[in-house]
């Protein structure tokens, strides 16, 4: 099964997510998402970037965070998710050595 990645130009991305170009520049500047091209005029974004921005917009609405706060929150959420997965894997490995009655 092939993976299909949808890409967006700056204009398409802004229309799809509802952010302005100014907000997009700030989001990229904060490292929340990264475009495919470093050249500002030719930025391309994938569907994963769109879902990250939509998640960021929910945080902005629900918690009234500014973009730097959203960047920190997303970083912490990703780290939390990574640690949960690591913990799950370690528990699986540990369960091999623990005998259950």
From Swiss-Prot:
Pfam families: MerR_2 (PF13591). It comes from Salmonella arizonae (strain ATCC BAA-731 / CDC346-86 / RSK2980). Interacts with CbpA and inhibits both the DnaJ-like co-chaperone activity and the DNA binding activity of CbpA. Together with CbpA, modulates the activity of the DnaK chaperone system. Does not inhibit the co-chaperone activity of DnaJ. Disulfide bonds: none annotated. Belongs to the CbpM family. InterPro entries: CbpM. This is Chaperone modulatory protein CbpM. It comes from the Bacteria.
